Amino acid sequence: MEPAAPDLQPVPEVTKGVPVPTPDSGCCRAAVTTVVAISVASLTLGVLSAFLSAQGVQVEHTAQLHGVRFTSLLQQENSDFYRLLTPALQTLLHFLLRALQPLSLDQEADILQKGIQARLQGQGLSLAAYGTITSVELTGRCEGPVTERDLKSGHCPGNAFSCQNSQCVSKENPECDDRVDCSDGSDEAQCDCGWQPAWRSAGRIVGGAEAAPGEFPWQVSLRENHEHFCGATIIGARWLVSAAHCFNEFQDPAQWAAQAGSVHLSGSEASAVRARVLRIAKHPAYNADTADFDVAVLELARPLPFGRYVQPACLPAATHVFPPRKKCLISGWGYLKEDFLVKPEVLQKATVELLDQNLCSSLYGHSLTDRMVCAGYLDGKVDSCQGDSGGPLVCEEPSGRFFLAGVVSWGIGCAEARRPGVYTRVTRLRDWILEVTSSADTPVVPTEAPAPITPSTPWPTSPESRVPNTTAKPTVAPTPAPLHPSTAAKPQECGARPAMDKPTRIVGGISAVSGEVPWQASLKEGSRHFCGATVVGDRWLLSAAHCFNHTKLEQVQAHLGTVSLLGVGGSPVKLGLRSVALHPRYNPGILDFDVALLELAQPLVFNKYIQPVCLPLAIHKFPVGRKCMISGWGNMQEGNATKPDILQKASVGIIEQKMCGALYNFSLTDRMLCAGFLEGRVDSCQGDSGGPLACEETPGVFYLAGIVSWGIGCAQAKKPGVYARITRLKDWILKAMSSDPSSTAHPHTSSTRLIPSQPPTTTAAGLIPEASTGRPATLRATIRVTTRPLNTTLSARSTTTRRQTPAPGTTVFSHLPDCGLAPPGALTRIVGGSAASLGEWPWQVSLWLRRREHRCGAVLVAERWLLSAAHCFDVYGDPMQWAAFLGTPFLSSTEGQLERVARIYRHPFYNIYTLDYDVALLELAGPVRRSRLVRPICLPGPTRPPEGARCVITGWGSLREGGSMARQLQKAAVRVLSEQTCRRFYPVQISSRMLCAGFPQGGVDSCSGDAGGPLACREPSGQWVLTGVTSWGYGCGRPHFPGVYTRVAAVLGWIGQNIRE
């Protein structure tokens, strides 16, 4: 009998970035193939939970995508679409299937295909726009009768939370979120934990930032014979969690002591306490060779006195989900550099990002187990190191509590690129940890408190092991508060930082330092500050539309470059407004579409005190719980109109939309976003309107998530701040910014556009910053972009001298009579172009990675020097991996010269996110052999090429967008576009180090694989000069998106200072 068609009901909850669970050993493995249109890379899909009621059978499936075939745009891993769309679609998809009997594999494949499509269409995603998935694999399939045991606590299916009364809660991470989900309240029963009274951005441990007293009150220094050896985390009054490998050699508890309540290794603070270790329990399955199950539980001889500086971190439930890309904190006293074996005196802190398990496993040769989790960044620079072992990896949840996600375990080197830190995954070992702590028969009521550390107090020792007194700096220790003999050591709030003053308000926030929020602007009417604004371009600010309900534009000025309302310090700038455009759908009654675009009367000159914030893509996701920064000069207290002289800042968490909608009686629209804390205390207030809600998406790079709009009161409990959601308004913003700036009409929308009676004073265009408002979507290289700094200076040699910077109007290599000479050739078209002949472009170089394949272009500018694009070397920065191929237009030729690259120098101001200063010098191991096939190009003078100049681009890149590489050098003629025209196509990304070339109608362009190649223009003398280096662009040959090139004239000084013959 054919089984009845199943009833497919996609469950509405979607959880981002959840890794695929590992199936039980009894599960079978089967592969099914399906074709699903979707826009995602290496996407992990979730659990199919099938409850077949008629047979009383429970079937679980685990599905994983394979064989993704991308469109050309998504092939660029450094594009905005790839970088932002991919994690946006990393979702756990739930399907509820009902059938009369188990399904066949063919039926499962059909259900899987339909279910995925239904779920993604439900999220409003276009399924056919970006690529095709060619196969899906069922990695697990387990079935059996649903027994009573399966429904008891700890046996809920999938990632469902198990209540003590056996209720299963399917909501992600319901424990300690300040909302009772279990009918017996057990999900909120043990939640004296995780509060963060103050938030500060973290630096690094390797080269890191110092932690403040009380900032990490769960951090412990484990001392082996008085020397700091490992870190540990407080999880209870008498219990610590650390790494098992810390005790490979020293397993006797008598050799160990714990120091808590101090950020100084010396324990010089009066808050420092110490306790002897009574017992060390390593996991029974710990493997010293593989570092699997690398966890240990330590029992202290005396309970710790919880207080302002000593608090436990929260243990997550076994079902707790820490999604990839979540920002978490590490801390420790480990080495600051891999090769600098000196530990810091002060506790170091860092922010790291959780990485996808499959990705990290591939980086480590698939040696990871399910008990491990990776955190860090692919480009390195931020990591734990030796001496940090056993310390905490803690993640803050929307409730404001910190949960222990991992224990510092191992890694290759410290902060190396593509070698993130590996941590013991606490959720997989939580049950064992609780088993150890609950099996102890020692009393939990303290008989005496651990002594505070003072100069006269010896370390606690056993009778068998006496040690001398400590030599801490003398301090006056206050008398500790007495503990009643019958009172257990109880945390005030587990995970709290009572010693840290939480930035309790821009209502009462903390002062920002100069340059900390360089995109913040103050809008003043006369001398009165009335609203904030945010810099998004050299001529553009964003603010709230309601700020201009009753404002005379001619009286408004924007003040920037300083944190002082009085204009003291920094680099203060005061500019008038040329126009204000309110969103055409702005509703002053409900404050929907509450955004305004302000055009400045003059362009800004960017510096370290004035910078734009990045605008997110429309598909950018700011996940619930993400910590973001608000800033402004608004009221410091509700009802108190006193404004601070110094800019205030605070950290707030993104709040789930449905929850916030319920708090505001469902009056929110999709153009609104909530941020703050349910308990209140942190909020924007009157006078902050129009200011930024900025989120740090990658280290040091902030994106504008919202604009301060409205709220009920200021910092009230359960009344968070409401912000205009930028992702929903981005299209209008860009359209408004791309209108003709010389127009005085209403060129872009029907919005209210106010024009002042006085015409603006025109000045020279200002510099564009090193961090712009948007990441270019397509680089011209075929290499993924990550950051790895390289040396940018050369040590002087006794036998050579540096070349002097050329005088204005001269050419660096004008002394080379044959530079820039080439046989005359027809200027045709690289995308849709024609092949170059032998010797036609003798300065063109192909850069080969590992001597296997062409990856980038380069240009010969001297006998042993090449110029290329800096982004070509973001991942592969070792010159030993590169070789230069010259003297032939054929990649498969055996005739050309192959030269080894000795050194790579990227411009010191190169910015990986904006591609500003995207240029690199390559020094060859030896001089090239000049001939009619190999000769350098001339470097230009300092002036810009004239608009409309006809120049040539060459390279072996793709012949069409998404196509294959050319095997013979291609050439194309393009027109140089004016800076104003270029900015109209790319309103916020263009800096003065960039120029555009191509045609408005498209059709002719450089493409992937051409990066680093030349944009060459012919002088009247017949010599060719290097005007630009191929850098980036949107797609290839698209209308209205010309190619963007690094302007060589803008970096002549740097080139001249570094090149020597």
Swiss-Prot record:
PROSITE patterns: LDLRA_1, LDLRA_2, TRYPSIN_DOM, TRYPSIN_HIS, TRYPSIN_SER. Gene3D superfamilies: Low-density Lipoprotein Receptor (4.10.400.10), Trypsin-like serine proteases (2.40.10.10). GO terms for biological process: plasminogen activation; proteolysis. It is a single-pass type II membrane protein. This is Transmembrane protease serine 9. InterPro entries: LDL_receptor-like_sf (IPR036055), LDrepeatLR_classA_rpt (IPR002172), Peptidase_S1_PA (IPR009003), Peptidase_S1_PA_chymotrypsin (IPR043504), Peptidase_S1A (IPR001314), Tmprss9 (IPR017324), Trypsin_dom (IPR001254), TRYPSIN_HIS (IPR018114). SUPFAM superfamilies: LDL receptor-like module (SSF57424), Trypsin-like serine proteases (SSF50494). SMART domains: LDLa (SM00192), Tryp_SPc (SM00020). The serine protease 1 and 2 domains are catalytically active, whereas the serine protease 3 domain lacks the essential Ser residue of the catalytic triad at position 1011 and is predicted to be inactive. Residues 462-476, 740-752, 792-808 have a biased composition (Low complexity). Residues 3-31 are cytoplasmic. Proteolytically cleaved to generate 3 independent serine protease chains. The cleaved chains may remain attached to the membrane thanks to disulfide bonds. It is unclear whether cleavage always takes place. It comes from Rattus norvegicus. Serase-1 and serase-2 are serine proteases that hydrolyze the peptides N-t-Boc-Gln-Ala-Arg-AMC and N-t-Boc-Gln-Gly-Arg-AMC. In contrast, N-t-Boc-Ala-Phe-Lys-AMC and N-t-Boc-Ala-Pro-Ala-AMC are not significantly hydrolyzed. The active site is at H245, D294, S389, H546, D594, S689. CDD domains: LDLa, Tryp_SPc. It is found in: Cell membrane. GO terms for molecular function: serine-type endopeptidase activity; serine-type peptidase activity. Residues 155-192 form the LDL-receptor class A domain. Glycans are attached at N469, N549, N640, N665, N791. Disulfide bonds join C156-C168, C163-C182, C176-C191, C230-C246, C328-C395, C360-C374, C385-C414, C531-C547, C628-C695, C660-C674, C685-C714, C856-C872, C951-C1017, C982-C996, C1007-C1036. Residues 205-438, 506-738, 830-1060 form the Peptidase S1 domain. The chain crosses the membrane at residues 32-52. Residues 443-499, 740-771, 790-810 are annotated as: Disordered. It is an enzyme of class 3 (hydrolase).
